[in-house]
Structures are given as C-alpha cells and as structure tokens.
C-alpha cells in the first residue's frame, strides 16, 4: 500500500474530527454540516477499502498535522491562504429537500464512475426538475453533494450521489451521470428540465427549455434508447 495514500487518509480522519468539534460547539452552518456528513461516508468507505481503523488513523493524523503546524511559519501560512482560491457552496435545494427520505415503487440503480444514480421507473408522463447542491470554484462545478429529481408536486423520483467508497469526481463525471438520469426518466415519456443554476455551473450556459447541452456520447446513448423503444412499440402494434 502506498504510504502517501495512508498518510492522506490519516490526515483526512483528523481534520474530519476537528470539523466535528466545530459542529458539536454549534459554530457551523448548514453547508458545513452537509459536507461533514458526506465526508463521513467517504471516510468509512476509504477505511474499509484500505483496511485501516478510523480511530487509530485519526490519532496518527493528529501527529502529522501538529508536526506540520510546528514547522509552519505565520508568514508562509498567510501566503498559502492568499494563493488558494475559495470555493462557494450553491444550494438549489432546501435543507428539507436535501434531507427528505423517499421511496421507489420500481427502483433502478446504476453506478456511473464514482457516482450512484437511482430512479423510480414507475414515474410516467411527469414534468421533472433536476436540482442539486454542490460547490463551485472558478465558476465551475467542483464537487457534487447531492442531485435530486422532483416532480411538479414535489415528489422525489431520482437521485445522483457520490459513492462513499470512491472519493472524488470530475465535472464530466457529473454531466455523464445527469445524461444517464435524464435518459432513464425520459424513457417513460417524462419531460426533464435542469435548474438554471446547475446548467450555468456544469455547462457554462443555460437552455431556455431547461435541457443541458449533452455530449456526443450522451446523445448517442439516448438515440439508441429511442430506437429501441420505437422497435418495441412497432412489435406491440
């Protein structure tokens, strides 16, 4: 096992512990708590994959951080902070929408890279809006926290979330997963739109119809789906 992989995990465990203390002392806001919960799932998955105990890793991570801080000068710390771009947290969904439990009559789940896509195949002929909470850096989507698909009535019928065991994903991973979710929902004649906020930071533009600009790969995948459906309809006739 690579030593840098282990030390990175140990430091992440300790930093999560520090952030948890901030929450316990009621010094955090909703986005901070949201990221803490997401990172907890990620650390559990990484610990299982690496075969490392989180409590022991946290202790070692503390020693690593203390050593770095002891050697770090105040001036170097100021320069590092000044040169690091700050990310912003974007919220399409309210806390209630983000934390609400939902159920599927005909569940379907698909893993696309480091992201998990879930949708209810029982939903038909509905107008659906995709909304997401995510972080942004340099005006581009950085990290997806959670994406959900809502009907006009407010019911949740689909979701995209990061896999805890596969930390880290790119903007292309997110766009590909959105394309898969849209294709799955449109299979049952649903009309799917993407929030303007998500369009802006994921694609850098917005579509008046609410549809994101799809990649050639996504377009081919959706075209194959449409052709298969037409063939089935002809056979049924």
UniProtKB/Swiss-Prot annotation:
GO terms for molecular function: protein serine/threonine kinase inhibitor activity; RNA binding. Keywords: Eukaryotic host gene expression shutoff by virus, Host cytoplasm, Host gene expression shutoff by virus, Host mRNA suppression by virus, Host nucleus, Host-virus interaction, Inhibition of host innate immune response by virus, Inhibition of host interferon signaling pathway by virus, Inhibition of host PKR by virus, Inhibition of host pre-mRNA processing by virus, Inhibition of host RIG-I by virus, Inhibition of host RLR pathway by virus, Interferon antiviral system evasion, RNA-binding, Ubl conjugation, Viral immunoevasion. This is Non-structural protein 1. A motif (Nuclear export signal) lies at residues 137-146. Pfam families: Flu_NS1. Residues 223-230 are annotated as: PABPN1-binding. GO terms for biological process: symbiont-mediated suppression of host cytoplasmic pattern recognition receptor signaling pathway via inhibition of RIG-I activity; symbiont-mediated suppression of host gene expression; symbiont-mediated suppression of host mRNA processing; symbiont-mediated suppression of host PKR/eIFalpha signaling; symbiont-mediated suppression of host type I interferon-mediated signaling pathway. Residues 205-237 are annotated as: Disordered. The keyword Iron-sulfur does not apply. InterPro entries: NS1 (IPR004208), NS1A (IPR000256), NS1A_effect_dom-like_sf (IPR038064), uS15_NS1_RNA-bd_sf (IPR009068).
């Amino acid at each position: 096992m690579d030593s840098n992989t282990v030390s990175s995990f140990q430091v992440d465990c300790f930093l999560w512990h520090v952030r948890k203390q901030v929450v316990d002392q009621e010094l955090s806001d909703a986005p901070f708590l949201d990221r803490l919960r997401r990172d907890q799932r990620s650390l559990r998955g990484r610990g299982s994959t690496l075969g490392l105990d989180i409590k022991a890793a946290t202790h070692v991570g503390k020693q690593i951080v203390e050593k770095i801080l002891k050697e770090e000068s105040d001036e170097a710390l100021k320069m590092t902070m000044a040169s690091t771009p700050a990310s912003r947290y974007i919220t399409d969904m309210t806390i209630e929408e983000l934390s609400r439990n939902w159920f599927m009559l005909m569940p379907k789940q698909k893993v696309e890279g480091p992201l998990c896509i879930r949708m209810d195949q029982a939903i038909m002929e509905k107008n659906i809006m995709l909304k997401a909470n995510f972080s942004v850096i340099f005006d581009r989507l950085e990290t997806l926290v959670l994406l959900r698909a809502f009907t006009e009535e407010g019911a949740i019928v689909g979701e995209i979330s990061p896999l805890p065991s596969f930390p880290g994903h790119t903007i292309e991973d997110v766009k590909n997963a959105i394309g898969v979710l849209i294709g799955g929902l449109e299979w049952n004649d649903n009309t799917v739109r993407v929030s303007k906020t998500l369009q802006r930071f994921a694609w850098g533009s917005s579509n008046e119809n609410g549809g994101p600009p799809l990649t050639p790969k996504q377009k081919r995948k959706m075209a194959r789906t449409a052709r298969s459906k037409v063939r089935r309809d002809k056979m049924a006739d």
